[in-house]
Amino acid sequence: YEAIDLLKGMISRPSFSRDETAVADFLQAEWQKAGQKVFRKGNNLWIIAPDFDFGKPTLLLNSHIDTVKPASGWTKDPFTPEETEDDQLYGLGSNDAGASVVSLYEAFCILSEKEQPYNLIFLASCEEEVSGKNGIESALAELPPISFAVVGLSLIHISEPTRLLS
């Protein structure tokens, strides 16, 4: 399945905050192979749906590609994606926030297949874990005005699962 393979590709590349180039290069190449026109500023990547119309409101789908460095408690290689017996994907960034990036990208692709009453922009931002100056704020300055957004962390129950949920 392409989405799982994309997530595995993200996991297998170090993407620590302020050093996300390897994963940004990988995602840009994969999305371009899929026919997407990918825009880039630093390690921020975005795609604008082809039927963009300034007369419509704009929905931003956003999650981040950076991770924290692995803590000492890891019992397996954090950069070797592994599917567990209970269909979980193990690896650094699989949960925070690779799964969100892949899920929101897939949603963008599906929604972009037909005209919507709103514009769609998908943004995979960097430096979220450190609130870096080269992250989402620098990317937003390059985008058309955003009316509303689905952000991985804001909709935690949908796109960034944590232990806070039961």
Listing of model-derived features with the role each one plays in the protein:
Residues 22, 102, 134-135:
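Generic recognition of short, well-ordered alpha-helical segments
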Residues 142-155:
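A glycine-rich helix N-cap at a beta->alpha junction
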Residues 1-70:
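N-terminal helical capping/dimerization or prosegment-like subdomains
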Residues 5, 118, 144-146:
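Structured loop/turn residues at beta-strand edges in well-structured enzyme cores
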Residues 56-121:
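Active-site metal-coordination/substrate-binding segment of hydrolases
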Residues 65, 123-131, 136, 154-156:
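Acidic, glycine-rich active-site loops and adjacent beta-strand->loop/helix elements
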Residues 139:
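Substrate/cofactor-recognition hotspot
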Residues 156-166:
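Single conserved hydrophobic/aromatic residue that forms the stacking wall/gate
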